[in-house]
Amino acid sequence: MHDVYVTGVGAITCLGADMRSTWSAIERGRSGIHSVEGIDVRGCRIDFAGQVRGFLPPAGLEDADRGVQFAAAAVEEAMRTARLGPDDLRRLGTGAAVVVGSSKGGVLRFAALHKHWLHAGTGVTETSPLHEFWSSVPPSTAADTIAGRLRIRGARFCPVAACATGTVSVIRAAQLINDGCAELVLCGAADASIHPLWLGAFDRMGVLARPHPNDGPVGACRPFDAERTGFAIGEGAGMLILESARSVRKRDGLPLARIRSWALGADPSGLTGLDATAEPVLCVIRTSLDRAGLRSADIDVITAHATATRSNDAAEALAYRRFVATGSRPPAVTALKGAIGHMLGAAGSAELALSVEMLRRQQILPTANHARADNDTTGIHIIRHAQGSQLRHILKLSLGFGGHIAAIILSRP
């Protein structure tokens, strides 16, 4: 068993192309949900999302899928934060690994290639771009690209777990270090799914938010709020550098947080719904707590999944109420999707990276667009404005369509 530390974080969201600008905007209570630009969304009932604007891809990746570009850029930021260079990774040999997930792969590139196939009318020729399929569409493309650019020779994984993908990826990375299979892991997830197909598909599922009557798209996604109607699709990436204690000591690194424990589980209730008793979610939370050797009163903040859908926010809130021991103070709860949208496969790792920053800065980020709870979401301590606090332990929960449940407890190093 080996301790696992976070030494670097990187994030790209609709509020900024790095962690600093994203943090600053969320701290001020801003939301990055606006009308979609540059994409033909005629025919879509929902035409707004958390779109990353003004993004410049890393050199050499100008033609890559947008999700791959996000992943590579966020890894570069995480490495800068950790004060790591490519030579540091190469010296580790097979001790450096990559675990970068995707909920669906390069869907924008796939759509572009399919459009070419339909309209070019030339079939498979020497000049057709179809050869790009295998280098840009499979879910593992981001992991492959990062490992190739940095010449990493250790293990390489691409978890796929719907909207829990980012958190599951970090857990898989922590397991590699904990089991002694790696000394350092670049991990997280990226997602770029702002496209009419996904806007339409999620709309038909009934999970996309409607414009708020007063605030429009900016106020559409309202976690735990009485007026919640669903989420807004976001895009971007969240990446973390995980290291063993030995690796941190050897290179005189600076830990930002310790990954204290984790737990995985599933809710078999259906594709999108949660068990109304919240028992499956509560079981995973309690398992993570037991593995950490902590009590519910030790958790200072919960970074919630909170998609702002009617039933799932209610079940999640119930899990948090049941989680708190009788007589204990309830932990603060923050939900970030009102600010950065639902980044789908990247949601967990982006929100986890922001949770690491909360520990480092000793500050709790606010829940954008939460005005008042209803009967189903009352009884939890939702943070509406940024506030300083003495933080020791943060619980991050992620849920995914199909029943995926993942939890990580972060502690001060």
Label each PLM-derived region with a short phrase.
Residues 8, 26, 75, 98, ...:
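Conserved small-residue
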Residues 1-6, 86-93, 292, 296-298, ...:
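Flexible, low-complexity linker/loop segments at domain and module junctions
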Residues 77-96, 149, 248-254, 284-301, ...:
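Phosphate/pyrophosphate-binding loops at sites that engage ATP/ADP/AMP, CoA/4′-phosphopantetheine
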Residues 1-60, 82, 102, 246-258, ...:
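ACP-dependent fatty acid/polyketide chain-elongation machinery
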Residues 1, 34-73, 105-172, 181, ...:
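Conserved catalytic cysteine-centered active-site region
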Residues 71-83, 139-142, 150, 156-190, ...:
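Active-site-proximal alpha-helical scaffold in enzymes
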Residues 181-229, 262-276, 306-313, 330-380:
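Acyl-CoA/ACP chain-elongation machinery
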Residues 3-7, 30-35, 213-292, 300-301, ...:
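Condensing-enzyme catalytic core mediating Claisen C-C bond formation in acyl metabolism
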